[in-house]
Amino acid sequence: MNISRMEQRVLHVLAQGGYIRHQREDGHICEIECFTREGYLLSDCTMAVFQQLRRKRLIESRMGSPYRISFKGRENVRAQLNNR
């Protein structure tokens, strides 16, 4: 599956334990914020990247909770070197 650089960056943060918090208005998602595991805000996660990840089913939300990486997303994320 083709995954853009921005999608890959967001997926990598989610794979390490991050999450995407969303705000709804009239049943539609109007605002998103992507947080790393340490609690920092990731500025690379835009609404367009979020919609692409949802369309490809690489992220999922269960019962209104924040969006996290799905099993399909874990399979498609490429490994990256960490400082840890």
Swiss-Prot record:
InterPro entries: YjhX_toxin (IPR018654)
Transmembrane segments annotated in the record for this chain: none
Alphabetical list of Pfam families matching this protein: YjhX_toxin (PF09857)
Highest taxon above the source species: Bacteria
Family under the similarity heading: Belongs to the UPF0386 family.
Designated name of the protein: UPF0386 protein Oant_1614
